[in-house]
Regions:
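Short, charge-rich, low-complexity alpha-helical interaction segments
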Residues: 1-6
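Gly/Ser/Thr-rich phosphate-binding loops and adjoining beta-strand/alpha-helix segments
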Residues: 10-81, 203-206
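Acyl-thioester-dependent acyl-group transfer interface
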Residues: 27, 59-240
């Protein structure tokens, strides 16, 4: 069992929604080139940018009540880049080699410190073993004959812990226009899990929030406003 499971705290972070409900995708587009240049200037990856946006937005939505809460960022790590990868594994397609890691982050004093904190935590995990452990552990959950997934009793409910999910999909469909990203999952009585994704096509940098159709509108507004605030911060950042 992954060690990080023992560090999770039961808490309801997301607004309650009435059932039935379904997932919709809200997308915001920005010019890619200036954002890419700004991120390189401060040596921060898009993934760290997403982590910073979501965790600061969630804390703002809760009006300071969870400022001292350590948040676990549930994200994919390419296990090919770790020291545990052999030559055969390195040749596999990406999604066959993506492990899951939970990266714990704390609130920092300002946006820049948050960006650097998230960058460093992400870098630590890329050189660690958590994603590899999860990759191996989850492979044992699949029944080879029926392909059913046997969920262990000790597996935490992702909807009811101090977990957020962000994922940068990277570069997609270069040369195409008006790209839209969509993903659906069920909303049950157990809850739901708003996801924040990013992708680019060399021209547009897109953020996509997956959320219930009847979620508190303030939640969406806070995510959007925080995205704009942090992107404007990196675009206008000047070293002291």
């Amino acid at each position: 069992m992954p060690e990080t499971w023992n560090k999770l705290i039961e808490i309801n972070l997301y607004p309650k929604v009435a059932l039935p409900s379904y997932i919709v995708n809200t997308q915001w587009d920005f010019d890619y080139a200036p954002i890419s240049k700004a991120l390189r200037k401060i040596n921060v990856t898009p993934q760290a940018l997403l982590m910073t946006i979501y965790q600061r937005a969630l804390r703002k939505y809760h009006e300071g009540k969870i400022d001292n809460l350590i948040l676990g960022v549930h994200t994919h790590i390419n296990c090919q880049s770790t020291k545990y990868s052999n030559d055969i594994f390195k040749k596999l397609p990406f999604f066959q080699t993506a492990g899951v890691a939970i990266i714990f982050i704390e609130k920092q004093e300002n946006i820049l410190d948050d960006l650097i904190h998230c960058r460093n935590k992400l870098k630590e995990e890329k050189n660690g073993k958590e994603a590899c452990m999860c990759y191996c552990y989850e492979s044992y959950l699949v029944n080879e004959k029926t392909m059913e997934i046997n969920i262990p009793e000790k597996m935490p409910n992702i909807y009811k812990h101090n977990l957020i999910f962000v994922s940068n999909l990277g570069k997609v469909l270069v040369g195409k226009k008006n790209i839209k990203f969509g993903l659906k999952f069920d909303i049950t009585e157990d809850g739901y899990w708003p996801n924040l994704y990013a992708f680019n096509n060399n021209e547009t940098f897109s953020l996509v929030l997956l959320h219930p159709n009847n979620i508190d509108k303030k939640f969406i507004e806070v995510i959007h406003d925080m995205s704009v605030e942090i992107i404007n911060f990196i675009l206008n950042y000047k070293e002291k």
